[in-house]
Amino acid sequence: MELFVEKDSIVREIWGKSDTVLFIFAGASAEFALNKAVDWLYFTGKLPSDPLGRLFSTVKYAKSIVFSPKDDANASIDVLRKIHGKVEQNRGTQIPDWAYRDVLFMLIHYSIASYELLETKLTYDEKEEVYNVFHRVGTRMGLSELPLNYKDWLPIRESHLKENLKQSKYTFDLFKQYKKHLGVLRYKVLIEAQKLVVPKHVKKELYLNDFSLLTIVIPIYKFSRNIKIDKFFKNILLPAKYKTEIKELDIHPG
């Protein structure tokens, strides 16, 4: 049975840990809010009405691709494309191709940044492997103009950040929704987490400084994993109604 991502792949290591995945989506939540195509997320109303539920459903989809046999993963990608196609049909216009690429680029960047923050620096080959996996996802979705390798992707990623991110009314509303659904303390943690993984251009657009209070906390959290109390911290940081979803983040299917 051919797997979409090999069992010894660094991508499985990254997406098999709940804390890494949570940092991936902390970063993506900041970048999403600035994307010039963020209005698409408001068209269905799902993200602003339940940002955490949307997060966990997206995680579930990503994990179903990373940890599945190749045929099943491709089928999941095809379904994802059909879902977006239906939204496009309902709105009567197409999601720009660059917007699809932006989402793919987020997954690449934050997979690498989050793992390096919480675990260890990745080798160039490992970064190339991360890029290759998501390149295959993008290719299956029919995206064009995808760089062939990680090295060629880096300057394209930088140009996407400068061209496609800008503050809008949706930016401020989305952060308002984050705060509403997380509460003041958890929202503060989200902001501090974003500071650690978002690119400089995102920080500039969101007026985020370089210092994060989590710089002090992360070494303590890493130690907590060694003595198996990290779940306690996760339960504190996320609302109780998402306990099942939090637990499932550490389940490695396939």
Regions found by a protein language model. Give the residues of each.
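Mature, function-bearing regions of proteins
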Residues: M1-G254
